């Protein structure tokens, strides 16, 4: 059922979009029913206005640039327009559980996010979700709001990660308001519109497992299989095949994160996507100076989610997912041995994580070093580089980008990367071995540099860049948000006119801290 566009004051493309959102197909997540979600309108947001808008993401939904200038756009994506939607088509908050910082946290759920529904365009379907849309039954002690700074960070990073080639939720827009929100200080409220094929998390499976709701667990798994992994239905054990897909996509995602120095910050099981997407951008960070133990989240005092721990934590989280799926596994076995066989099968599939992750990361590192062929000492060469980078806190992004200038013939191109290291002798020792390795390659320097610059970005969302955009946005100057977003859409291009966005962070950036408070 759809609502009358005239009731909500919408017309044209926004009316059509709203009509689609309130008419859920049978295969949509929202059609799973009240066991999985609670419907409610978004909380009112006073005098909403557009802070940032992604024309690329809008195109995925069939929206044209300029639509953000329609006053009704801010009303819809602030959630205000949903207050006039019929009860059966209201936005929804889903329930899930999970492990937070390694401890079972019990029931969680969308505490400040509301699903709007699904849109189909160009043969693809996307679910839309408003983060910061107000309290839900799962808000616990929270106020259900998001603040401007965290919303801008998520908007920018969602789009930046996509253009780095990393699986991620997308961001359509940020809607701001002067409505006050109290955190450590008084800030202003904002809503970011997330766009993804699905927002199903590991924690959804954990929830129904922990509540002994095998019927709901099966319905959820069937939904994911039918929508995203239909080939699993042909497997001997479809649910084991689903687990295998999660292992593969999660391992691949960890390769992508590690390869660009990205640290998520809150890898709780409720923040892990069943599709292997990067979701829930909170206290994330791209490393500046390389530190294997880099902790981007000020709240992570034990370093559980440090950079070097991310693959291990992803593996641990997959164990939690496997446990959640156990009641569905092993149906092909006789009842007397089903439980033991299910565990054996799950352990075997989980073992595939290392088999997938390790060689994929090795291949990525060879590409980052510009090596076409494989040699026995390549891993050691890469590891030695990281050791020297760690000892010197050499900038992660600039080190790999500038390695493209190193010549296999002489030291004429070394300076750009050498200057990033305080211990020049240590770097020289490494680069001489690197040059010797390059001499074994048939590809010439120019061709190698082009290839390296396709995998080593020049531009990433450094914290100080986001902070500058946020500070200006707080003064109602949103130009830097869009300027930075435009730069990040071309991370591998030289963009000489934007050289300042690729430089080392200023001294004041060292005092920046991000935490779970958002």
From Swiss-Prot:
Is Membrane among this UniProt entry's keywords? no
Hydrolase: is it a keyword of this entry? no
Tell me which residues this entry annotates as catalytic.
270 (proton acceptor)
Protein name from the UniProt record: Protein nucleotidyltransferase YdiU
The UniProt record gives the binding positions of ATP as: 109, 111-112, 131, 143-144, 194, 201, 280
Q: Give the EC number.
A: 2.7.7.-, 2.7.7.108
Give the keywords, sorted: ATP-binding, Magnesium, Manganese, Metal-binding, Nucleotide-binding, Nucleotidyltransferase, Transferase
Any single Pfam family the record assigns to this protein: SelO
Name the top EC class.
transferase
Catalytic reaction equation(s) = L-seryl-[protein] + ATP = 3-O-(5'-adenylyl)-L-seryl-[protein] + diphosphate; L-threonyl-[protein] + ATP = 3-O-(5'-adenylyl)-L-threonyl-[protein] + diphosphate; L-tyrosyl-[protein] + ATP = O-(5'-adenylyl)-L-tyrosyl-[protein] + diphosphate; L-histidyl-[protein] + UTP = N(tele)-(5'-uridylyl)-L-histidyl-[protein] + diphosphate
Could you tell me what this protein does? Answer: Nucleotidyltransferase involved in the post-translational modification of proteins. It can catalyze the addition of adenosine monophosphate (AMP) or uridine monophosphate (UMP) to a protein, resulting in modifications known as AMPylation and UMPylation.
Tell me its family.
Belongs to the SELO family.
State its cofactor: Mg(2+); Mn(2+)
Which Gene Ontology terms cover its molecular function?
A: AMPylase activity; ATP binding; magnesium ion binding
Q: Where does Mg(2+) bind?
A: 271, 280
């Amino acid at each position: 059922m759809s609502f009358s566009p005239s009731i909500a004051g919408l017309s044209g493309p926004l009316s059509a979009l709203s009509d689609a959102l309130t008419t859920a197909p049978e295969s949509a997540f929202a059609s799973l029913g009240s066991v999985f979600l609670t419907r409610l309108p978004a909380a009112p947001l006073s005098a909403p206005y557009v802070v940032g808008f992604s024309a690329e993401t809008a195109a995925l939904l069939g929206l044209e640039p300029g639509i953000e200038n329609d006053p009704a756009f801010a009303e819809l994506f602030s959630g205000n327009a949903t207050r006039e939607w019929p009860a059966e088509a209201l936005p929804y908050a889903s329930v899930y559980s999970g492990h937070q910082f390694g401890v079972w946290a019990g029931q969680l759920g969308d505490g400040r996010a509301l699903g709007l529904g699904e849109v189909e365009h160009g043969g693809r379907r996307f679910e839309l979700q408003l983060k910061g849309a107000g309290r839900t039954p799962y808000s616990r002690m929270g106020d259900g709001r998001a603040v401007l700074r965290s919303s801008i960070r998520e908007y920018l990073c969602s789009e930046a990660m996509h253009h780095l080639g990393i699986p991620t939720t997308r961001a359509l827009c940020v809607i701001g308001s002067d409505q006050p929100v109290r955190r450590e200080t008084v800030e202003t409220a904002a809503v970011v519109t997330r766009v993804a094929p699905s927002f199903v998390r590991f924690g959804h499976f954990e929830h129904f497992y922990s509540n002994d709701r095998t019927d709901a667990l099966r319905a959820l798994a069937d939904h994911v299989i039918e929508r995203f992994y239909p080939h699993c239905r042909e497997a001997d054990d479809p649910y084991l095949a689903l687990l295998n897909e999660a292992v593969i996509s999660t391992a691949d995602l960890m390769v992508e994160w590690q390869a660009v120095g990205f640290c998520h910050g809150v890898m709780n099981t409720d923040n892990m996507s069943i599709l292997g997407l990067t979701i829930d951008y909170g206290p994330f960070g791209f490393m500046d100076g390389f530190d294997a133990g880099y902790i981007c989240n000020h709240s992570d005092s034990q370093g559980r989610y440090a950079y070097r721990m991310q693959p291990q934590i992803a593996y641990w989280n997959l164990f939690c997912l496997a446990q959640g799926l156990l009641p569905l596994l092993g149906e092909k076995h006789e009842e007397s041995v089903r439980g033991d066989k299910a565990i054996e099968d799950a352990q075997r599939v989980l073992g595939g994580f290392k088999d997938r992750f390790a060689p994929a990361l090795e291949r990525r590192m060879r590409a980052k070093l510009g090596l076409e062929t494989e040699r026995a000492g390549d891993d050691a060469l890469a590891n030695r580089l990281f050791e020297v980078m760690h000892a010197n806190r050499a900038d992660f992004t600039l080190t790999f980008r500038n390695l493209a200038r190193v010549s296999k013939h002489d030291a004429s191109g070394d300076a750009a990367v050498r200057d990033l290291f305080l211990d020049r002798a240590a770097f020289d020792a490494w680069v001489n071995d690197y040059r010797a390795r390059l001499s074994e390659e048939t590809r010439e320097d120019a061709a190698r540099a082009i290839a390296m610059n396709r995998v080593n970005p020049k531009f990433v969302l450094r914290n100080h860049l986001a902070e500058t955009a946020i500070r200006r946005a707080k003064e109602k100057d949103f130009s830097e948000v869009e300027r930075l977003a435009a730069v990040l859409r071309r991370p591998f291009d030289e963009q000489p006119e934007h050289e300042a966005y690729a430089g080392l962070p200023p001294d004041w950036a060292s005092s920046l801290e991000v935490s779970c408070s958002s």
